[in-house]
Amino acid sequence: MMIFILIIFTLAILLILFNKRAVPVFLYHQVNPISSSVSPEIFEEHLKIIKKYNMETITISEYYNKNINKNSMLLTFDDGYYDNFKYVFPLLKKYNM
């Protein structure tokens, strides 16, 4: 299952690179080791793929207030779960996002 998710994520990034008009939004809910959502390890693999393909993560404000390059994307985290702070925030800092 993990390999399948990584393949789909990589294909989505590659499709984005060839579509100059789209700004994709990747929506996450829980990111933790015990949920049925994404584990921190899988989320980190997603961030590595984003870096590998030189994607730029932007905020909603940046989306509305500046010219967006073709490699821009949004990462969103719904519902304000504590695991977003515990697991996601340190990984985003680690990868300068």
Predicted regions and their residues:
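Catalytic alpha-helical scaffold of carbohydrate-active enzymes acting on polysaccharides/glycoconjugates
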Residues: 3-97
